[in-house]
Amino acid sequence: MEMKKSGLGTTAIHAGTLKNLYGTLAMPIYQTSTFIFDSAEQGGRRFALEEAGYIYTRLGNPTTTVLENKIAALEEGEAGIAMSSGMGAISSTLWTVLKAGDHVVTDKTLYGCTFALMNHGLTRFGVEVTFVDTSNLEEVKNAMKKNTRVVYLETPANPNLKIVDLEALSKIAHTNPNTLVIVDNTFATPYMQKPLKLGVDIVVHSATKYLNGHGDVIAGLVVTRQELADQIRFVGLKDMTGAVLGPQEAYYIIRGLKTFEIRMERHCKNARTIVDFLNKHPKVEKVYYPGLETHPGYEIAKKQMKDFGAMISFELKGGFEAGKTLLNNLKLCSLAVSLGDTETLIQHPASMTHSPYTKEEREVAGITDGLVRLSVGLENVEDIIADLEQGLEKI
């Protein structure tokens, strides 16, 4: 079903649906490991890719196909691939496009496990990795080499919400025709930002977050052009990682996407109100949010994003000790990692999600010991603020 001319909410609900034998409104969960062939000849044709059809759920499943079609439509890309986690999506993609002797340019500020993969994983297998500030385009330009195969980044970045000009960066990266630009779009989602429309080659997601939105699934997604998607599916996913998403989990995300647009509207609206509260609070030292005019990436965010998101990071006067006091005294906000859930989540990046960094690496990346990260949920905003207020009073 072609939905590219429809609104985002309509696309999230209707795109990629498959007709099934019984005409069910909800997508069936095809809970099977393998699929029966009509004949030996048909099995041979499918393995030879001469005939479309399912073989084995690691290679594809009807429930998962619907999810893949939906994310491709939402990102306005040619093809999607579902994986068992965000790290599965990132790893499968990188193991497909990289080989020993290749070079990667990436940002100093990344999700902790992505940083560990770049800093300790890829380098074990002969891939050179250079860390730069990708918001500084001169640094990107100076880091590029003849063997640069990938430029990888997040925008907004986790956890300090740094913004990168995707269109300008893609133009620099593509001066080398062999370089692929890969962007983690988890924080922005296709509700706010569509990197493929700005020159990016591959988009990755932790679908655990806003796309599912209910905190009950671990999943990853990749969107790119068809040729690359086929390579990632049949090399990175099939042979290198085996990070296959089960049909049950795919179903949960398909269901979550039915409310995707209205959830994102509420997330962002709540966040704007909370930013205003935090920015005026006497115990808050600094607020990091791309919707603030004082944010260094504000103009770029305004240009390439529809809204500014629902992730807020802030530093308290009193540093980490003040942060611990706040975290330990909240009653409504949940002290938990992850993000994009219906519940408001709060955590301490330096000791939690970004603990793979050394203290020195965190300082270079702008992840201070006093930084607190807030994922704004869907509760009534006055209740979230009241909880933050009473927690801040304890400092």
Swiss-Prot record:
It is an enzyme of class 4 (lyase). InterPro entries: Cys/Met-Metab_PyrdxlP-dep_enz (IPR000277), Cys_met_metab_PP (IPR054542), L-Met_gamma_lys (IPR006237), PyrdxlP-dep_Trfase (IPR015424), PyrdxlP-dep_Trfase_major (IPR015421), PyrdxlP-dep_Trfase_small (IPR015422). It catalyses: L-methionine + H2O = methanethiol + 2-oxobutanoate + NH4(+); L-homocysteine + H2O = 2-oxobutanoate + hydrogen sulfide + NH4(+) + H(+); L-cysteine + H2O = hydrogen sulfide + pyruvate + NH4(+) + H(+). Gene3D superfamilies: Aspartate Aminotransferase, domain 1 (3.90.1150.10), Type I PLP-dependent aspartate aminotransferase-like (Major domain) (3.40.640.10). It comes from the Bacteria. PROSITE patterns: CYS_MET_METAB_PP (PS00868). GO terms for biological process: transsulfuration. Pyridoxal 5'-phosphate binds at Y56, T57, R58, G86, M87, S206, A207, T208. Its cofactor is pyridoxal 5'-phosphate. One of its GO terms (molecular function) is homocysteine desulfhydrase activity. Substrate binds at Y111, R373. The modification N6-(pyridoxal phosphate)lysine is found at K209. Keywords: Lyase, Pyridoxal phosphate. Homotetramer. Belongs to the trans-sulfuration enzymes family. L-methionine gamma-lyase subfamily. Catalyzes the alpha,gamma-elimination of L-methionine to produce methanethiol, 2-oxobutanoate and ammonia, and that of L-homocysteine. Can also use L-cysteine as substrate, catalyzing its alpha,beta-elimination; this activity seems to only minimally contribute to the production of hydrogen sulfide (H2S) by F.nucleatum in the oral cavity, which is toxic for a large variety of cells in periodontal regions. PANTHER family: CYSTATHIONINE GAMMA-LYASE, TRANS-SULFURATION ENZYME FAMILY MEMBER. This is L-methionine gamma-lyase.
